[in-house]
Amino acid sequence: DTNHFADADIIVVDIPLDISYLDEDPKLDFSSFLESLSVISDKIKKGCLLLIETTVPPGTCEEIIAPFLRDELGKREMGLEDIFLAHSYERVMPGENYLASIREYWRVFSGLDEHSALECRKFLETIIDTVNYPLTELKSMTASETAKVMENTYRAANIAFIDEWTKFASSIQLDLIEIIEAIKIRSTHSNIMLPGLGVGGYCLTKDPTFAPAASKQIFKKEIQFPFSRLAVRVNNNMPLHVVQVLEDNSSKKISNANILICGLTYRPDVSDTRYSATEILVSRLIEKGADIILHDPHLSFGKNFLWK
């Protein structure tokens, strides 16, 4: 019931933002996102904190959302100064410790102005253990947006980095995990990733493309972000390498094999299969004629099972 928006002192927006790809060129689509904000702005009351938690491209809050809200609120003879607009991105880890990952972790935030930032700070202090996990306030909402996108791009690139070393070590029979554990003793390299199936989930598969999309669509710049784009391509192809490893090391042809896949979700202890690397793996194995058996304790399987 959208009428409840009128009663809220704080509205937290966590609506997915659509992005599509044409010839690997990311294109942002704000239509459904702004449509939702239009519904909110039609009911929001004066003095309400509107907190954007969605991971959005740099510049979205200041260049897209703020002007849009100004126009929408104007229809009610209200102004942007009548509400508090802020951005603070999620830092959560879905799974067994989901709630703890919200309360017991550092958060970054910023507001459209100092009053909005203050209201955002006061709200975050009610849900986060800021004594042990102090808040970090940035100078602008664009800086806060950039922090989230850069944070996830760094992680995606770190995962992509290990792919070529996985192939190299495999080709000359090296134990890459043993090598990585030796490297991780050095504190500056403690976050190097282990080999895996690839990147999955809603965030790391798309967030690295937000920067090039924002550069072109929002700021009208021609910064290409080649490294970020390459990381996405490498990660998308990782499951295909696993198929090749199976073909090279199996005594049986893939087309005649019964293969049990244990674990379909993008990470442990969740039921979310969105953009799971396992989906790419299963699809390619089926293309090659394998008979696939799927098992995941967090999912229900049936004739109409769909990845979602």
Protein language model annotation of sequence segments:
Residues 1-308:
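Structural/interface elements that position substrates and couple domains in central-metabolism enzymes
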